[in-house]
UniProtKB/Swiss-Prot annotation:
Region ranges (Disordered): 71-91, 159-182
Organism lineage string: Eukaryota, Metazoa, Ecdysozoa, Arthropoda, Crustacea
Stored InterPro entries: Rbsml_eL15_core_dom_sf (IPR024794), Ribosomal_eL15 (IPR000439), Ribosomal_eL15_CS (IPR020925), Ribosomal_uL23/eL15/eS24_sf (IPR012678)
Organism: Faxonius limosus (Spinycheek crayfish)
GO terms assigned for molecular function: RNA binding; structural constituent of ribosome
Gene Ontology cellular-component terms listed: cytosolic large ribosomal subunit
NCBIfam families for this protein: PRK04243.1
Statement: the UniProt record of this protein carries the keyword Disulfide bond: no
GO biological process, one term: cytoplasmic translation
Protein name: Large ribosomal subunit protein eL15
Pfam short name (any one): Ribosomal_L15e
Amino acid sequence: MGAYKYMQEIYRKKQSDVMRFLLRIRAWQYRHLNKLHRAPRPTRPEKARRLGYKAKQGFVIYRIRIRRGGRKRPVPKGATYGKPKSHGVNQLKPTRNLQSLAEERTGRRLGGLRVLNSYWVAQDSTYKYFEVILVDIRHNVIRKSGSLNWICKHTQKHREMRGKTSAGRKHRGLGRGFHYSQTKGGSRRSCWLRHNTLSLRRKR
């Protein structure tokens, strides 16, 4: 096994003494930094490389902090209107995962860069910390690379907003087969719509 494989195995054993100490120190360090800040290099190089990161010009790593927990519905004084079924305010769970939310917030703040992917680095009782891999599409190294210039296309603008990253595809239910997550037809919505639309075909 190469060095990256050993690093991957170390990260899988998060309850070991080494990892517990390391993650605790990192969470303490990140807690004292800004909510969104640039990291000089990937904290987990083996994970970053598996997600497409290259140690070359045009690649940037940003670290972001996301508050853990459920999502409170943003309604004034709890006035939701409608039926009692939709009166919930406090104990709602977001449809999207926190990693996807981290990518979106990073993409909003850094609109000139493209979000490639992201990964978990640490967490404590209040926050989760993610590192987001971003690409500068105006850099000649990226534009001239045959394996990387696909992200320069205009169809890849704000891909994190449209569920195109790994975290986004996960919360959309893609990647595990349509039998698992009812996504036959491309998405959960299209599958639900087809099953709930009455189609009376005219006999000719």
